[in-house]
Amino acid sequence: MKPINTFFSSFLLALTLGLPATSQAEVEIPIMDLVDVRGIRENQLVGYGLVVGLAGQGDRNQVKFTSQSITNMLRQFGVQIDDSMDPKLRNVASVSVTASVDPMAGPGQTLDVVVSSIGDAKSLRGGTLLLTPLRGIDGEVYAIAQGSVVVGGLSAEGKSGSKVEVNTPTAGRVPNGATLEREIKTDFNQRDEITLNLRKPSFTTAKNIAREINNTFGPNVAVAINKARVDMRAPKDTQQRVIMMSMLEEMSVVEGRKPARIVFNSRTGTVVIGKNVKVGEAAVSHGNLTVRISESEKVSQPNAFADGETKVVNQTDIDVNEELAQMVIWPPGTELNTIVDAVNSLGATPTDLMSILQALNEAGALNAELVVI
């Protein structure tokens, strides 16, 4: 079996060496723009808080938990309120507070927080977020948030019920509104190897990354495990590991071929066609059949001296119109620009384009994946 394995390895090497060299026109992309490093990622925090100072735009009486939250907060400051008493506050809103913690952020760093209304408040504009603890998935408090809420939207309502609303007035941000109190632990420095997870899995990209790392740091430092993962041996010394990651940030490789894909957004009518989309030989004709049915009333008048009554009868008019459609023939291997020009020449709308591409896919003439979002 050993000679066979040796022959097979030599055969693969010969195939690799026989591939055409990378074109100078191909753009090299920084490795760190193609991968995520295991153990280095953002962490999400969430909390429940109160926004005050809303000038009558806060939660209404139907939102009971806002009143309960105010009562509990005032009790912490020594203000006693009877449980049966409803404060009926209009200047307060219950909100969710979220924040993203950058990888390896340390205590004392500030974070931007997003504040969103939970109840039926009309606007958070001009409000102030009171002291709010932010917790991680483990339930521990990692940051404290407080500050003035910046809202990009606005809302105005008249007594007659007319209303004008711009953007979303019930959500805003507090820039640098949270302070990180604890560091979120990571196992990055404890692992014997560094794992690079490709954002867009590709065997070619994984091979190019491993080869570039080995060319820089020496043979057998990195190995492509599969099309979505590359492992590289790393020094245990923290300083050397930082230097290694710094050098990795400066490396660039050529990305592998992207899959042929067409994306439809049926809600907005958006169609995005990838670069590598091609079609086989096909003839396309697209026309519109329009049927219009209209109802009208007509007076039925009998002849003079004849028995009969004057009545109003309904008359139905049906008009069928089929527009003349051109036929376009695509040769095998037709590329993106030819497809777009041909579809535009037919006068097709984005919705028509969806129908044409779906029909081509059913006919087996489209070598691309259709994705509907």
From Swiss-Prot:
Keywords: Bacterial flagellum, Periplasm, Signal. The basal body constitutes a major portion of the flagellar organelle and consists of four rings (L,P,S, and M) mounted on a central rod. Assembles around the rod to form the L-ring and probably protects the motor/basal body from shearing forces during rotation. PANTHER family: FLAGELLAR P-RING PERIPLASMIC PROTEIN FLGI, FLAGELLAR P-RING PROTEIN. InterPro entries: Flag_FlgI. Its main location: periplasm. One of its GO terms (cellular component) is bacterial-type flagellum basal body, distal rod, P ring. GO terms for molecular function: structural molecule activity. Residues 1-25 form the signal peptide. Belongs to the FlgI family. It comes from the Bacteria. It is found in: Periplasm; Bacterial flagellum basal body. It comes from Vibrio parahaemolyticus serotype O3:K6 (strain RIMD 2210633). One of its GO terms (biological process) is bacterial-type flagellum-dependent cell motility. The keyword Disulfide bond does not apply. This is Flagellar P-ring protein 1. The keyword Signal applies.
